[in-house]
Amino acid sequence: MTKKQSFLEIETLIKVAKVLDELKIPYYVSGGYAVSIYGRPRFTADLDMVIKMVPVQTDEFSGHMETLFPKGYVDREQINNAFKEIGEFNVIDPESGLKIDFFIAQKGDFEEECFKKAKRKDVGYKVKFTSPENLIISKLLWYKDSGSTRHLEDIESVLSNSNIDKKYLDSWIKKLGLEEGWDRVKALE
């Protein structure tokens, strides 16, 4: 990734965060971009954002995305279907090539905690990122589903570069049954 490409991706992140703030849609950044904030920088092909959007907001949101990325990929039908079927949709910025994966927040205690603990980090604009603890837990959930060791490497990176609330982390690992993945992470250290 070139410096210009990286700059364009950050610009895209900022534009999307500003729209979400303007529309008062709660959100946080997770995935590889969050790993780069709390751990070692790493390449990621997409931007993962969890949003608390309700179906009545889809038209306004879609309109803003179409204005922001007039030559990009914005599929209103996919956005509407995210509430009925798949729980996610994406938008592509043609200038940076960045694919933004939007995940509709699921109901549950852990998801509520993720929104409560999300922190604004200044990347040229104060964008909300998941907390390092919740990033680790999310990565353990993804590892449990996919088996990809990339998630374990990301966790190791976040652990080595962030101040972590171990009590909070241990509590949620137990509640969500993520001990097996957590044991694998500890074996990497």
For each predicted feature, which ranges?
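Compositionally biased terminal segments of proteins
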Residues: 1-189
